[in-house]
């Protein structure tokens, strides 16, 4: 913005992130196990956008924002499971029951 004396003034609004940037931010924050509402706040979603995002995460398999959220959480779930399996294979008495539960989950499919 330029004032009447042609000097620049700072913009009062920040540029909004691109759709890809927003999806990446959501995925990264979800991977850090942030709540849906916290992610909405950190990405400057309006209250209406927040409600839509919360609804999408709970009810939509096709919404790109919901997919990014689920994908981020699943990456963390994968990392945690890998650690548990690694510790179980090394004889950890705390990790072995968890690894057994993971095996039972997969038998149901």
Model-based region annotation:
Residues 1-2, 109:
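Long, charge-rich, low-complexity intrinsically disordered regions
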Residues 61-79:
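Short Lys/Arg-enriched helix C-cap and helix-to-coil transition segments
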Residues 2-14:
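Short, Lys/Arg-enriched N-terminal segment that forms or immediately precedes the first helix
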Residues 74-109:
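Amphipathic alpha-helical protein-protein interaction segments
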Residues 41-55:
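Short, basic interhelical loop/turn and adjoining N-cap
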Residues 15-34:
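Short, amphipathic alpha-helical "recognition" segments used to contact nucleic acids or chromatin
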Residues 30, 54-61, 65:
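DNA major-groove recognition helix of helix-turn-helix
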């Amino acid at each position: 913005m330029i004032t009447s004396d042609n000097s620049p003034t700072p913009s009062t609004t920040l540029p909004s992130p691109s759709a890809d940037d927003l999806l990446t931010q959501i995925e990264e924050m979800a991977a850090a196990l942030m709540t849906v509402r916290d992610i909405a706040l950190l990405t400057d979603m309006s209250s209406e956008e927040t409600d839509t995002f919360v609804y999408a995460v709970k009810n939509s398999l096709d919404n790109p924002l919901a997919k990014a959220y689920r994908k981020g959480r699943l990456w963390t779930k994968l990392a945690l499971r890998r650690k548990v399996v690694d510790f179980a294979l090394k004889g950890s008495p705390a990790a072995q029951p968890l690894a057994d539960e993971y095996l039972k989950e997969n038998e149901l499919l």
